[in-house]
């Protein structure tokens, strides 16, 4: 984020970052006065930011009641991930066809940085979660960066940001993740090797399976939350 950005841009960047990274949770009320105090910005840029984020689907505006962080749902997640898999496959095929030695070197660098970031296993490891998430995003971006289409990359980046919101929800869930749940390092290495071998079909298949496993894990979490909420409602 740019520390010298105009106030409306700064407000948008700060709010978007906190929503995507779990500092502002799904369903949380967003009061303009509270956000002004939180960010040290005026009400006008805060309101402009809320309108922009509502257009992106990250904020829900409520008549005469302000705004809330948009809810998460299995339906939205499935739609989001289906779209991301399609776009990421297209980007990946184009990047494999177009990528040069510098692109390959950046993939190797990004994979090295990701492999050095410990996979978080507890919601208490917030700094570790943030670092791993950043390295993970960099790796996925490196894979598709040579696709040659600014439009595709913008669409991919937006889908990746929204899907990371769901991934972060799982990482911040009040449960520890068992080490045997899955080995994402093995998955990432397999994808990287297929990409560097210029085997587009294998790379796309591995990426589709990789994203599908993440989707399944988050769906399980959302189902558990729904069941818990229903149980609490029945016992209230």
Name each region found by the language model.
Residues 6, 130, 181-182:
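Short helix-capping and inter-helix turn/linker motifs at the boundaries of alpha-helical repeat units
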Residues 9, 85, 108, 182-186:
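Amphipathic alpha-helical repeat elements characteristic of tetratricopeptide repeat
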């Amino acid at each position: 984020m740019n520390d010298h950005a105009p106030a409306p841009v700064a407000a948008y960047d700060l709010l978007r970052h906190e929503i995507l990274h779990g500092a502002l949770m799904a369903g949380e009320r967003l009061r303009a006065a509270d956000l002004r105090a939180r960010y040290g910005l005026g009400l006008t840029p805060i309101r402009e930011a809320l309108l922009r984020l509502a257009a992106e689907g990250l904020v829900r505006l409520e008549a005469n009641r302000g705004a809330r962080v948009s809810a998460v749902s299995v339906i939205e997640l499935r739609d989001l991930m289906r779209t991301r898999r399609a776009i990421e496959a297209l980007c990946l095929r184009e990047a494999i066809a177009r990528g040069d030695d510098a692109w390959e070197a950046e993939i190797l660098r990004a994979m090295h940085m990701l492999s050095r970031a410990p996979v978080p296993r507890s919601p208490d490891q917030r700094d570790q979660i943030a670092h791993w998430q950043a390295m993970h995003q960099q790796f996925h971006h490196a894979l598709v960066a040579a696709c040659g289409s600014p439009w595709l990359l913008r669409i991919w980046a937006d889908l990746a940001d929204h899907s990371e919101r769901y991934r972060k929800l799982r990482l911040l869930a009040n449960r520890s993740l068992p080490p045997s749940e899955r080995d994402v390092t093995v998955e990432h290495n397999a994808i990287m090797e297929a990409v560097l071998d210029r085997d587009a079909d294998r790379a796309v298949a591995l990426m589709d399976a990789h994203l599908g496993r993440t989707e399944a894990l988050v769906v399980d979490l959302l189902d558990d939350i729904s069941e818990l909420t229903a149980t609490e409602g029945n016992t209230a």
